Amino acid sequence: MARMVFCRKYKQQLEGLDFPPYPGAKGQDLFDNVSKKAWQEWMAHQTMLINEKRLNVMDMGTKVYLTEQMHKFLSGEGYDQADGYVPPSNQ
């Protein structure tokens, strides 16, 4: 049976992550309060931000920015969108 958590983003019981995505207290908080669905959506959104904004993931400023965006995304706050991104149409 899958481990269930009360997801911070969706405000409901959903399947939890299989393991903490980061070491330490931050990773444990994500493990305890973020669903697998929300985390997968964040990973896709983060990839889109990196690609569309041409972010350098080796830059400390980028890491701080992405951490802030992750917090906003997973907390249901307003978060940045990729400028000029047009989702593919379902034809």
UniProtKB/Swiss-Prot annotation:
GO terms for molecular function: iron ion binding. It holds the Pfam family Iron_traffic. The keyword Iron applies. GO terms for biological process: cellular response to oxidative stress. One of its GO terms (cellular component) is cytosol. InterPro entries: Fe_traffick_prot_YggX, Fe_traffick_prot_YggX_sf. Keywords: Iron. Could be a mediator in iron transactions between iron acquisition and iron-requiring processes, such as synthesis and/or repair of Fe-S clusters in biosynthetic enzymes. Belongs to the Fe(2+)-trafficking protein family. This is Probable Fe(2+)-trafficking protein. It comes from Cellvibrio japonicus (strain Ueda107) (Pseudomonas fluorescens subsp. cellulosa).
